[in-house]
Amino acid sequence: MTSLVPGAGLLPIPTSSPLTAVSSLGVSLSSLGAIPAAALDPNITTLGEIPQPPLMGNVDPSKIDEIRRTVYVGNLNSQTTTADQLLEFFKQVGEVKFVRMAGDETQPTRFAFVEFADQNSVPRALAFNGVMFGDRPLKINHSNNAIVKPPEMTPQAAAKELEEVMKRVREAQSFISAAIEPESGKSNERKGGRSRSHTRSKSRSSSKSHSRRKRSQSKHRSRSHNRSRSRQKDRRRSKSPHKKRSKSRERRKSRSRSRSRDKRKDTREKVKERVKEKEREKEREREKDREKDKERGKNKDKDREKEKDHEKERDKEKEKEQDKDKEREKDRSKETDEKRKKEKKSRTPPRSYNASRRSRSTSRERRRRRSRSSSRSPRTSKTVKRKSSRSPSPRGRNKKEKKREKERDHISDRRERERSTSTKKSSGDRDGKEKVEKSTTPVKEKEHSKESDATVSKAADEKGSPRTEDEGKVQHNGNCQPNEESPCSKADAV
């Protein structure tokens, strides 16, 4: 906040000495500091040699003189220093026009601008640079800016102010006259009535009664006009009633003026009230519009949030669909893999099939060996023939043999399944199996060739004579000849 104090240009400055001016402010010289003698000397030559700062290019040329007459005063205590103190302090240098305090009041230090009436007082003021003002040394320098002054009064503005003042004076007079009016008005009316009746009686006595009856209205008007003239003459002669009547007229005029003014005031107040009501209505409409805008903004925000939620749900649904598609693809790939595996299994015979073939081949070999053993021992057949009555029928024997073969085949199948479900064996064991199978194949071929020779003898033995008890024991126990290696023993070893 800045404050402007007018100097010599606006208010009269007392012509007291600088010491008395400072003492009137209540500021001691010891607190302000010693004033250098060079500053008080009017014939200073050295101070005029201080160079002035260059001005900016955009400075108004009409303010150059003001800038040259202005001084910057800094390092002022914002709590104790006032514009009046600065004004009184710099009056000892020269005539001061304006003093403006500047800077923030809340800060500990402030600064000010002092404009002198004469440019010659500027170098004197510069001599105070470093002088103690209160508890701080002053910093004085040339100013780069002019003091911003209030606008000067134009003749039109002055005339408006005079009119307003005169209106106020007239209103005051009207109020005073209205207060005095009821007493003076009654007395004036009584005196006026008496004077009028006296003049009328004189005029009536001079004129005749019969002539009044015959006269026309026009003549009566002319007489009344003459009467008014005579009345004016009488009023001029008598000074006191004339003055009273003029006062009453002025009062009446003042009343009419006051009434007209009151009417004007009422109309103005009504107009102002209407304008205020319109402004209030506009403000209400604006507030409503603002509330509507806020509601629209809120609705827009809600719509955006809903759209975001919908988008999130759509993204989730898309992700779910993608997951489902992936699962379907995985299922399809699994199905295709299973189909391929099944096709491969259908192309390659299963191990159980090979095991069944092996079991069948082993049963065939056993049959062949039995037929060979029966052909080699013909003596036993004779004993069998003798004891045919005790042995059972050949049909029952064939059934028992079939059951035994089935049981053996079933056992061999179980063993092979157990082998297949167990851990896979090394490649060396598989090679060993293949070698064993290769070694057994020529034996099988030899036995097959012998089988064709022994079929005839076997058929004859089955028809002619039953088997011996030794053969029954061999079949029941499943033993093989000691000379040849049985496939069942090989399978057990494997």
Curated annotation (Swiss-Prot):
Residues 69-145 form the RRM domain. GO terms for molecular function: RNA binding. It holds the Pfam family RRM_1. The modification Phosphothreonine is found at residue 348. Residues 476-486 have a biased composition (Polar residues). It is found in: Nucleus. Its main location: nucleus. One of its GO terms (cellular component) is spliceosomal complex. There is a cross-link at residue 490 (Glycyl lysine isopeptide (Lys-Gly) (interchain with G-Cter in SUMO2)). PROSITE patterns: RRM. Transmembrane segments: none annotated. CDD domains: RRM2_SREK1. Residues 176-494 are annotated as: Disordered. Residues 183-192, 263-340, 404-474 have a biased composition (Basic and acidic residues). The modification Phosphoserine is found at residues 174, 187. Residues 193-262, 357-373 have a biased composition (Basic residues). Participates in the regulation of alternative splicing by modulating the activity of other splice facors. Inhibits the splicing activity of SFRS1, SFRS2 and SFRS6. Augments the splicing activity of SFRS3. Homodimer. Binds SFRS1, SFRS2, SFRS3 and SFRS6. Interacts with the spliceosome. Interacts with SREK1IP1. Belongs to the splicing factor SR family. This is Splicing regulatory glutamine/lysine-rich protein 1. It comes from Mus musculus (Mouse).
